[in-house]
């Protein structure tokens, strides 16, 4: 994977959130516009601010379009096209408590998978400031932590 792009309503707010919650620092913050960009992204008159944040071997791209747009995210996790970004953690209970202390908006406390191929793994979903779903995930104790 090269990167995962997430469209946000306020780039500065999102940069502050991802730094505060997960320690992600921008590699760069820049702007984009013009006919080539508009054609490439399928948005007439596209004008945007965006940033790349390094996450392990990949990158999270945060994009804020200045175009007429819908500023509410209406997809539920069960809706086709609904993404989520997952962060691997070594201790989910500690990560959950730390993120709660920073104001994270979790769907629930961590859940441990009882059976199947992910038996023993734990996860919890949370929302970023735009309502995009994030996840923290702890590998089962008998599986290597990546």
Where in this protein do the model-derived segments appear?
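Short, structured motif recognition centered on aromatic/hydrophobic residues
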Residues: 1, 18, 53, 60-62, ...
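Short, solvent-exposed beta-strand edge segments and adjacent coil->beta transition regions
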Residues: 1, 48, 80-84, 121
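Core segments of cupin and vicinal oxygen chelate
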Residues: 7-57, 94, 101, 119
